[in-house]
Amino acid sequence: MTNMETTYAAKDFFEKTIKSENLESRYEKLYINTNVRSNYLFNSSIEGIEKSDLIILIGTNPRFEATILNSRIRKNYLKNKIEIISLGDVGDLTYPYQVISNNTDTIKDIIDNKHEISEKIKKSKYPSIIFGQSVLKLKSAPYILSLIHISEPTRPS
């Protein structure tokens, strides 16, 4: 297992050195716009997740998809009692989390400040929003990611 930035660097290396674009390591086609670096980079770092004061999980079960990340989330929860919110019920993550609706409209409502957790995100100093692979499988993935990028400039610094 490797992070997306390393995978992308390897892909770029092979394309430039041996002129090969015949690379595929995913079992399913996922929407990943590699023109936007933040689409494939885990910005906070795995260690950085321990600084988060609010974590929102979208389309992911880190207990099975990213066990090291999940252990860092758990460590942060146990130490700081942070709030963790998941769009959809993903089962036992080994720490408590609030479940909210699992649909694209919910994401839009959060960004448009029409959802109850919008205010929590605004008040948070170090929020982390973690997208999982299941979001990238959706036909609406480009739309969902565009919503996030549209909202970035309005995020207070």
Q: Language-model segments: what does each one mean?
A:
Residues 1-3, 132-137:
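Conserved short loop/turn motifs at secondary-structure junctions
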Residues 148-157:
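Single conserved hydrophobic/aromatic residue that forms the stacking wall/gate
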